[in-house]
Amino acid sequence: MSITKEFDTITAISTPLGEGAIGIVRLSGTDALAIAQSVFKGKNLEQVASHTINYGHIIDPNTGTIVDEVMVSVMLAPKTFTRENVVEINTHGGIAVTNEILQLLIRQGARMAEPGEFTKRAFLNGRVDLTQAEAVMDIIRAKTDKAMTIAVKQLDGSLSQLINDTRQEILNTLAQVEVNIDYPEYDDVEEMTTALLREKTQEFQSLLENLLRTAKRGKILREGLSTAIIGRPNVGKSSLLNNLLREDKAIVTDIAGTTRDVIEEYVNIKGVPLKLVDTAGIRETDDLVEQIGVERSKKALQEADLVLLVLNASEKLTDQDRALLNLSQDSNRIILLNKTDLEQKIELEQLPADLISISVLTNQNINLIEDRINQLFFDNAGLVEQDATYLSNARHISLIEKAVQSLEAVNDGLALGMPVDLLQVDLTRTWEILGEITGDAAPDELITQLFSQFCLGK
C-alpha cells in the first residue's frame, strides 16, 4: 500500500459478512457521489444536502433489475472521516446482497479498498494522526469498557496533544541553541547555558518517564493478562474456569487427566481482560496424549503474566503440589485453596500466608481473586484515572523509551562537560523519535505496515 495520496474512489463492505439486520457498503473519493448515483434509483445523490439519508433502490444499470431496497447516507468533504466525499449504502444484511452491490460499484469505476485504506486516507488528509488511527483499531478490538475508555481518549487526541506539545518545546530549545551558535552577538536572546539545557532536558525526561509509568497499566487493559490456571489433576481448575466465565467451557469430572489440552477463554474481571488458560493437570503420566497436554501446560506457565495455582484443601499436600509451588514461585502468583467447604486436611503451615481460601462449588471468596489482581498489577490504585493519558501500544512504549535514552545521552554529555552545540544531535533525535509516534516523522514502510493490520472497510 503506497502512502502517497491517491484520489481514486475506493469501496468496501464495512460490516461483518453474514446474516444481520443491515449491511453497509462504503465509498470514499472524488467520484463517490457519481458512482453511487449510477446504481441508485431515488433522489439525485449529487444534489442532496450533506449528511442526509436518502431512501431508494439499488439497481443493476445493465439490466434495470432491483438488487435491494436501501437507505443511502451522503457526506460531503471535508466534514467526513476521510475528508473526502463519502457515501454509505445501508442494505439488508446478508452475504449475497452486500457482495452484489460491491461488485456493481466496482464495475461502475470504484476500486476495492485495501485493509485500513479509509483510515489511511483520514491520516494522509490530516483528519487524524498515527496515534489516533491506531486508536480506531484499539476501539474495535477493545475487550472491556476500560480498554475502550483509553482508546477513545487516544482517538480524541490526548496522547497526540502531549507528544506534540513536548516536540514543540524541544524544537524551541533547539532553535535557541542554534541562535546562540549562529548569532552569539544577539543580546536579546537568552543564552542556552549548560545549566539551562540540563534543566530543560530533565524536564522533558521527567514528563516522558511519567508517561512510561502508565504503560504497564495501559498495556494490560489493552492486551489483557495471560493467566494460567495450574494445579495437579482434579483440584478444581476447570470448575474455576467455568465459574469465572459463568458458563461451562471445560469438562468437569472426577477423573484425573480429563483436560488433555490447553483451553483458552477471555473474561472481563472488573475491567481487566484476562485470557484464562485452563491447563492440563501437571503430573507424571504414561499417557502420550496427556503428556503433550502437560508439556503445553508447563509452557503456558512460563509465558503467563499471572498464575492461579489451585490446591485441594481437603487433601494433604502431595509432591506434585510442592513441585508446582516451586515451579511458580517467581511468577505473579495467586495461590487458591479450593474445596474449603469440605473437611480441611492440607498443611497450612507449609504454605505462603497470602493464599486465598475459596470454594468454587459454593462461590466462596471468588471476588477476592479480583481484588488480589488489582493489588498485584495496579497497586490498589484503581484501573483508569479519568483525566490521565495512558500508553498502551507497544510501538508507542518502545519509542518513548528510545526518546528517554536520547535525553539521558544529552544529560550524560552535559555531565562530561561537552559543548552545548555537540549535544544538539541527541536532542534532535529525541524530537524525531517523538514524531514517529504521531506519524510526523514515521518512515513510509512503518505507515504501510500499520494500516495493513486494519480490517477491510475501515
From Swiss-Prot:
EC main group: hydrolase
Subcellular location: Cytoplasm
Domain TrmE-type G: 224-378
Transmembrane intervals: none
Gene Ontology biological process terms in this record: tRNA methylation; tRNA wobble uridine modification
Lineage: Bacteria, Bacillati, Bacillota, Bacilli, Lactobacillales
Natural source organism: Streptococcus pyogenes serotype M4 (strain MGAS10750)
CDD domains xref list: trmE (cd04164), TrmE_N (cd14858)
Residues binding K(+), per UniProt: 234, 253, 255, 258
Gene Ontology molecular function: GTP binding; GTPase activity; metal ion binding
Domain of life where this protein originates: Bacteria
Cofactor descriptive note: Binds 1 potassium ion per subunit.
GO cellular component: cytosol
Role this protein plays: Exhibits a very high intrinsic GTPase hydrolysis rate. Involved in the addition of a carboxymethylaminomethyl (cmnm) group at the wobble position (U34) of certain tRNAs, forming tRNA-cmnm(5)s(2)U34.
Binding of Mg(2+), residues: 238, 259
Residue sites binding GTP per the record: 234-239, 253-259, 278-281
Keywords: Cytoplasm, GTP-binding, Hydrolase, Magnesium, Metal-binding, Nucleotide-binding, Potassium, tRNA processing
Protein name per UniProt: tRNA modification GTPase MnmE
